[in-house]
UniProtKB/Swiss-Prot annotation:
This is Large ribosomal subunit protein uL1. PROSITE patterns: RIBOSOMAL_L1 (PS01199). The gene is rplA. Part of the 50S ribosomal subunit. Keywords: Repressor, Ribonucleoprotein, Ribosomal protein, RNA-binding, rRNA-binding, Translation regulation, tRNA-binding.
Amino acid sequence: MSGDGSCSYSAEEGIRELLQSAKAKFRESVDVAIKLSVADSKSGESIRGAVVLPKGLGREVRVAVFAKGEHAKQASSAGADVVGDEELIEEIKKGRRLDVDWCIATPDFMPQISAIAKILGPRGLMPNPKFGTVTLELAKMVGIIKSGQVKFKSDRYGIVHVKIGDIGFTPEDLLENFNAVVAAVQGLRPTTIKGSYVRGVFVNSTMGRSFRIAGIG
């Protein structure tokens, strides 16, 4: 979150300034950083959730599904990139790396998936009922994720980092994604916080400076 904190911009202005200042010779990512009045190391609270970016991520979102029988067929038909059962779990145990962004599982697979939790967990891939990724509605969930759903979690400093696109996006599309992320994070405000919840919001590109966004509390 480096940048000149003395200047603040509206979300629209900040995004336009960011795009104009991006000079790298590659397609830089655009990220939002939201500083919250929670810090895992002190309060034990963290903010975690998921949000569908209205304009997507600008790339394919890949999904793996653990299911069998008719549920596996539904997942495949819905566009899941990897579909497997116990055999897939065994392959992962032996070192197969899943090149995916999300994993979904039917509830009956969770006891078996626990055996690879130490593999999936650090990559943020463990199916979780809070994200709707432990479900029998596989086709629906695959569709939601493929449409551009992203996960987020506050770090130990109370900061949520989310990619909202890249410099190839229009300002309008980035603004839509930005607003969706901010609304999702604001909607998860803990009841234990009595004062200010959002302390600062910044947008930045991979190699560029950050721009502080005003008017978000």
